[in-house]
Amino acid sequence: VIKLDKPIVAFEDAEDGREDKAPRKIIRLADEREVQIKVAFSMVSIEGAKKNLNLELEHWDFDTVRKEAENKWENYLSRIEIEGTDEQKINFYTALYHLLIQPNNVADVNGQYKNAKDSVLLSPFGIYYSTFSLWDTYRAAHPLYTILTPELLPDMVNSMLLHAECQGYLPIWTLWGKETHCMIGNHAVPVIVEACLKNFPGIDVEQAYHLIKKSLTVSHFKYDVEAYDRYGYFPFDIVEE
């Protein structure tokens, strides 16, 4: 959903000879010198996107939005202070910024989300995290989340458990709530186990154990238990990488 602070006087097809799958449009405004645009997404519905837009950003004060974003980032980036040269600080805080741009809450403001099977559900905790690049992040990023952003950990883990309840095994590499199956293995396991061993609140340890055991002992796409038990690894001619 897109909303502008200037009236639209014309909405035309872009005739540039390109054959894109999505239609390309040209918007004509009464005053084209300066325009502010709000954009909102929803994985559930257009109505959901409208609600997200209206509740998450009610005003048109650009400077206020910029300051609010600055304050939010300052809250997270200031949790670690380092000493060094300006270049070293730039490199470090850029890496810290990259750490914090995912995972993403893909639920609407009302807590609705689409699960791995495209069913619309209501998150029991109002949030549903996705963009779990777990084979990249289980080694260092997720352990750092337990130290740097502990308030976010239970919702991350519970999102993984919701995903596993739906598709039958823990997430491999999720994007917009769907499984991409990028890479083999079960890298969600150490992430969940660490959170449980560190006694993060709000996590059902028995449920976590059940889903971990099921993910490790029941074959699923790119995970052949019999092949692994026989060879101790996944042969490329038996298990697709």
Predicted features by range, described:
Residues V1-Y128, L162, Y169-I172, G202-F221:
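Acidic/polar, glycine-enriched structural segments that form the non-catalytic walls/loops
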Residues T180, I184-E241:
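Active-site lining segments of carbohydrate-active enzymes
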Residues A69, D136, L152-M156, A188, ...:
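Stable alpha-helical elements in mature extracytoplasmic
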Residues E19-D20, S130-T131, A141-H142, P150-P154, ...:
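A conserved hydrophobic secondary-structure block that centers on an alpha-helix together
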Residues S123-G126, T137, A141, W176, ...:
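Flexible glycine/proline-enriched surface loops and loop-helix/loop-strand junctions
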Residues N52, K72, Y76, T137-R139, ...:
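A general alpha-helix detector
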Residues E87-Q88, I127-D136, H181-A188:
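Secondary-structure capping and boundary motifs in well-ordered enzyme cores
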Residues T94-A107, S130-L153, V193-N199:
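Alpha-helical support elements that line or immediately flank enzyme active sites
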